[in-house]
């Protein structure tokens, strides 16, 4: 867990300028549940910065939700922006985080301003995300051209899966 007690948290919260300009509540902060990405998109710096699939790391769902609970109880946080490169990339880990938020009945809203691994989403997961407080998913669809996505930027995204998820 980050040493937020060493930061002027009230100043950050008062400024209320999270990663995304879209917020529902007033006491917003950022956190991460994972680090890196296993996709090898040509344009993305995540692989260069964090390393590829072999360096991709997820945090324990319990520790992620412990941190959320700590933020609620200590700082009065009521909204989280997950700044992961791909919050849903490890679907099992993502589901366990959601299950734990739901189990603890945490009153938290959250979003994924950096984007989300669309290829890991299905209707059931989206419904569970909403139940756990999600109000915004950012779909990182850099092109509407399937060939360009796969061959030029090397993004493992099947465009035919996107529209049904939005409906």
What are these regions (language model features)?
Residues 2-167:
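Radical SAM [4Fe-4S] cluster-binding motif and immediate context
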């Amino acid at each position: 867990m980050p040493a937020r007690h060493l930061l002027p948290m009230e100043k950050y919260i008062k400024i209320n300028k999270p990663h995304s300009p879209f917020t529902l509540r007033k006491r917003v902060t950022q956190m991460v549940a994972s680090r890196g990405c296993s996709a090898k998109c040509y344009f993305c710096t995540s692989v260069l910065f964090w390393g590829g699939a072999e360096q991709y790391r997820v945090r324990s769902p319990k520790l992620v939700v412990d941190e959320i609970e700590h933020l609620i109880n200590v700082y009065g946080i009521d909204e989280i922006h997950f700044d992961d490169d791909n919050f849903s990339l490890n679907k099992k880990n993502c589901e366990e985080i959601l299950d734990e938020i739901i189990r603890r009945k945490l009153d938290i809203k959250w979003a994924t301003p950096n984007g989300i691994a669309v290829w890991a989403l299905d209707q059931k997961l989206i419904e569970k995300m909403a139940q756990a407080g999600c109000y915004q998913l950012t779909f990182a669809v850099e092109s509407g051209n399937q060939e360009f996505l796969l061959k030029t930027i090397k993004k493992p995204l099947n465009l035919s899966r996107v529209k049904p998820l939005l409906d």
